[in-house]
Amino acid sequence: MVITSATGHYLDPEARQVWDPGGLLKDFQQNAKWENKVRIVAAQIAELFPDSSVHVERLGSVVRAALGEAADGNYNEQSAIEWAAGFSFPANICERDSNLLDLADGDLVVMAKLSHEARENEGRLSTARVHATVPRDDPDFEKLLILCDGVQILVPKDFTPNTTPPLLRNKYKRVCTAVNKMFFEGYLEGLVYLLPTHRLLSMSGIHWSSAHWTTKAGKQKGRNIGDLSNDERGGALNSPEAKLLGQEAWGDIKHPTVDMLVGMVIRQYKRSANGWADVVLWKMDLKGAFTLMFIHPESVPLLAMQLTGGVSMVYHTGLFGSTLMPGAFDVISRVLRRRINSVIKGEIEIFVDDIMGACLTGELSSDLKDCTDVCTGLLGPNAVAVEKTGDTLATGHIDWLGWDINVTKGIIGISRKNFLRALYGFFDVDISKKVKVRTLQKLASWASRYSLVCRALRPMTSALYAESSGMRNLEVSKTLSGEAVVCIHMWRLFLVAMELEGEGYRRSLLTFELESPSFVIEYDSSLTGFGFRIFRIEYGSELLWRIASVDADFSLRGVSSYQNTMEYISVVLAFGYLIQQGERSKTVCVRGDNVTSLKWATTERFKGTLCTNAAVCLLALLSASSMDVVDATHIRGVENCVCDDLSRGVRPEALGYYGDVVINGSNSFLKNLLMLCNPLTTHSMIKEFCRFYAEVQRMVHDAVLRN
C-alpha cells in the first residue's frame, strides 16, 4: 500500500511502513540515476568478485533498504512543523515562573537557587548524595561536589553580557512551532524557565543567545538547540577560550574506544568456563543526559533566549549546544564508571550517558541491579531510562555505539542501521559533480571507522581525507580527484558485496588481542632496491631466518618523494615471503630507520596516494593469512647498515650470508608482488582499479592455497 501526501510519502517496500518525508524511496522507484548506479555496481562486483552471486535484483533490494533507513531519519523542517501541529504557547504560559521570580524579588539568581533546592528534594545530584555514594578518595570527588551547585558557564575575564537578544534566526522562525513545543515540554519537566521577554530586558546582567533547531535521526520533531555560538556582535558563550577553561576545570574527556569495549568483552570471555556461551552483554541509558545537571545559579542569567510571542526561555539545567556541557558531564561519567565497576561482578564502560556492560550469564541480574542502584543513588530515582535497558540473552547480539557485537559467534560488525546509512551515503553522493566538503568528511569518517572491521579497505580512506585537508568552510564544493572517485566506488562495491554474501563486515573479537611477535622484519630501502632480514623469535631470542636483496624493476629517477613508499614496499615483500612459506596467524615486529613506513605498517593508516598499491597488497596479504604487525622499533641508520647495503644492490653472499637463509632473487611470487606495488602505476579509473584489485586478490589467494 502506498499513501502519498503533499509533504511526504508512506511507502512499504519491505512489508513495513516507512516515513519518507524527502521522497527518497519514491525517487529510487522513479529515478533512472539510482537504477543506473545499481546496474553499474552490480557489474563491477561481478568483475571484482567473479564467484559472487550478486544480481541486480538483490542489489536493488539492499539499496532500497538503505534508502528506507535513510528515509526514516530524513526528517526536515516540514516534518518538524507537522509534528508541532500548529502549537502555540498557552496564554498564561509565563505565570508559573513569573510568580517564582516575584518570590525571588525579581532576582533570576535567587529564583534559580529556590527552584534548585526544590528539585533536590525530588531527587537529583546533591552534596548529600555524593557523600553517601562516593568515597572521598575518588579522584573526582571535589569536582563532583562543585557540580552539585551547578555547571558554571565559564567565560573569559573580559566577557560582558550583551543585554539584548540577537535577531531571531531564520530557521528558528520557520520551525518556531516545533522549537517552542519542545521548550514547552522542557518547561513542564522543570528544566527551563519561560518568562515574559520584557521582564528579562529590564534586568541587568542578562546574556542572550539564539534559539535554534536541527534534525535528529529517527526523530520527526528534530532537536531544539541553545546556540551559544551565534552572536554576530561578538561575545558568544562558546569560544576557544571558554573550551579551554572547561578543560582546566573538568579535565580532558576520554571516551571509550572500540578497542576498549572489545577488551572488556574479551576479559569476560576469559572468565567463562563455557566460552562465548556464558558471556552476556547489556546496556543502560541515563535519562536526560546533560539535563541531569543544574546550571549554577550565578550563570543562569547568561542563558536567555528570545522566542516568539513575547516569550523568552532561560536554561537552568544542562543543555545541548554548550561546549562546556560534555566536559562537565564527563566528571559524572568517570565517577559512575569507577563506582559501578567497584560493585558489579562484570565490567562496564560509559560513553556520556550510555552504559555498556559485560558479565557472565548468572551475574546479569545482580549487575543490572547494582548498576541501577549506583546511578539512582548518585543522580536520583529517575536517573535511569529503564525502557532502554537491554541485553544479549534473547538475540545474542547488541548495538554499542553503532557497533553490532555478537557474543554467540564472538564477532563484531557494523550495526544494521549504521551500515544502511553508510551505504546510502556512499550511493547518494554524485561523483560526476562537485561535492561539499562536509559530505567528503562524512564519507571519510565512515571509511575510517568501518575499515576497522574491513581491513582490505583501509587504503581506501586516505584519498577521502586528502580531498578536504585544510579546508575550513564545510559548505564549499569541490571537484573530486580520480583517487577519491575510486575510493567512493570501492566502498560502494564492498559495502554491497560483503552484505549480500551473507556475513557483511565482521571481525573476530579475539583478533583484537594480539600475541607477542613470532617474527621480526628488519628492513631498509633505497630508490633502486629493497633489503630485509627476517628473524624468528624463539625463547626470547632472535634467530636469523631469511635475508634478501631485491632490485626495483622500475625507475624512480631519483625522486625522493617515493622514499617512504619504497621503505614500505620492503615490508610488503617480507610479508609476502612469510606467507608464501606457509606462515599463518602469526604476529610480527617491524624494525627500520624510516618512521613513516613503521607507522603505516603498525597503524594500517596511510597518507598520500603513492603508497596505495603497496597498501592494498599488504592488507590483502595480512587479511588472507590472519597475520598482524604488533610492534615497531625505530633504529638509527647506522644500526641498519646491513639492510641498507642490501637495498643498494649488495648481495647477501657479499655480506657473508649463504645457504638456505638467502632468498632466491628470482622468486617469481616476489617479482609479481613487486610489480603490483609499483608506485608509478596509477589506477585513477574505477575499471583499472578493479582489475588491479582483482589481480592482487588472485595472487594472494593462490599463494595462500598453495601453502
Predicted features by range, described:
Residues 254-258, 347-349, 357-429, 440-443, ...:
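Polymerase palm active-site segment centered on the conserved acidic dipeptide of motif C
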Residues 439-442, 448, 577-707:
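RNase H-like nuclease module associated with reverse transcription
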Residues 394-510:
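C-terminal reverse transcriptase regions that engage the nucleic-acid substrate
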